[in-house]
Amino acid sequence: MRDERLFPLFQPLDALPGIGPKLKPVLERLVGGETIWDLLLHMPERWLDRRPRDSFDELIADEVATVRGEVHAVKAPYNDRAPTRVLLFDGSGFLTLTYFRADGRWLQSQFPIGKERIVSGKITEWQGEWQMSHPDFVMDPSRGEFPPAVEPIYPLTAGLTNKRVHAACKAAIELVDEAWPEWIDASLLAAEHWPSFKQAMQGVHAPEHYDEQQIDRARQRLAYDEALARELTFSRARTARKNAAANAVPEQRDALNRLVATLPYKPTQAQIRATKDIMEDLSQSFPMRRMLQGDVGAGKTLVGAFAAVQAAEGGYQCAFMAPTEVLARQQYDTLDQLLSPLGYAVSVLTGRDKGKTREATLMGLANGDIQIVAGTHALFQDGVSFQNLAMVIVDEQHRFGVADRMKLISKGRSPHMLVMSATPIPRTLAQSVHGDLDISILDEKPAGRQPVETRVIADTRIDDVVTAVGRALERDERAFWVCPRVDADDDDSSAVARAAMLRDLLRSDVGLVHGRMKGEEKDAALEAFRTGQTQILVATTVIEVGVDVPEATIMVIERSEGFGLAQLHQLRGRVGRGSKASFCVLLYRAPLTEMARERLDTLRRTEDGFEIAEADFKLRGPGDLLGKAQSGGVNYQLISLPEQSDLIDIASK
């Protein structure tokens, strides 16, 4: 239950003075919530130094300044478009305040001749004179009026001013009880020189002095609070999971050894470690929640197959869920080849299965005849039931939302779940989004995989690239050619235009696959390429993950400067899956930005997906490394990633 001392902060926004029925919905829209607590979490984006200058001599153009002077004159405009001009004098010179379309009588009342005024605003220089247009603050020092020494500047929305938001935040801070017990360890507070929670809130929303170091410490303290709150949430989730009941699936070493004996290669040490982790988890009486992270081509499906065998040998069912029809059927093919010869009943279920085939699959799942099934979202639709689902494996898990995974889990009695990702995630990001999961990492590639040589080439040399691709086709190799868009009248790098050009130049059948095609058309194009009916496949990024064609040795990516590092790495991972030397050509259009050059240089330098993920995280932040379904999970309000990653590390200890 929530501590009653927190109740004032969870009042509606109209509990604050000055927030009425008109302002309340506008403020709610701005802060993304309905409570005073939501308002306090709406952080300023910067802070303006409004400390007073000693004289007009200290003014600098284009800076915000606060000055004090005597009203020397108020000059009416000489035409409708000219401003009213107010002259202030401080003994060292003049400052002209300009007001366009202002009420003259109001200005006369605000600026009586001979009286002192304090004004604050942006300084400009015009014809050798200092000017300030429409000052932000006009104060009468004789009444004790002074602008704030530092003004927080907030992100705003239509209908709100910065002054109104600032005033609301200051009022909200008064509801924070200074007597709250401190939840941060005293030694950490002292080591980091962090203020108390209330002092930190004051430090960002209502600082008394302009001190960048103090403001930064206040922000750090609040950011750490957010990291700590998330870590505590994960900790509670882990505890709750361990208190939940699940079917304990005993380890099946003999069955796994039989599967290993059929393989034409030895599993990597990383695969063995991950399998041991999963075997131990499955043998527990509470549900497994584990993520298997692996670089492209690291052999995640084999590890998933080991888990499926353990479930099947225990008398349970296992479901593999993939995000697309192509991946689901490819996964089925792999599982069928691995497990059917050993006597396991493997099937597939996607939205495209109809009629008697679908009915037979549904019946097999319901009566338990099917032990292992691969499929898409169709697996968790109404009408699909399992006799004894105890293991759920979600491939390319970043393509699914939490709700999708929970729907599939609901088909069983608290089944164990393994989520697999071919997109390496930096450690900090994994802690932020998947802190409730145990993590296993595949950081080795199976023996026999060839390194992929990556070359960065200007698109002015595209003819040379086409010639090289032609020579590869003559050697019975295959090539991917990735384009950034489907079609465009003025862009020859579109998939449609490039496919036509390659057909003409190479005199070869060229496949084409893109997101606008129907599912059956995409499947047919991919199948033709996989079986060698076409030797070159022009595609958009729909082939980014999961497509496995060992004969493909060349990946050409046009306009590569427009792709993210992680996406380029995934595309490159479509080649280098066989025994022949493979190449990735990153075609770019000059001039390159510094960030684009750094991305391409990173790809050229390394094939390590985890190193690439860290670089992408530093270059572009967390959003591009996660699918839309998950990016909200790392949407910190106070923490800035990757700059404050260290706070997450501290909170997780």
Report each predicted region and the residues it spans.
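Upstream accessory/linker segments immediately N-terminal to the RecA-like ATPase cores of bacterial MutS
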Residues: P77-T262
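Structural detector for short beta-strands of small beta-barrel domains
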Residues: A61-A82, G121
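C-terminal accessory region of SF2 helicases/translocases
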Residues: F583, P591-K653
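Short boundary/loop segments of OB/S1/cold-shock single-stranded nucleic-acid-binding domains
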Residues: E45-A65
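Inter-lobe coupling/hinge segments of SF2-like helicase ATPases
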Residues: R273, F286-D601
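Extended, structured, electrostatic nucleic-acid-contact surfaces
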Residues: M1-P17, P25-V26
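Conserved pre-motif I regulatory segment
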Residues: P25-V26, V31, A244-L292
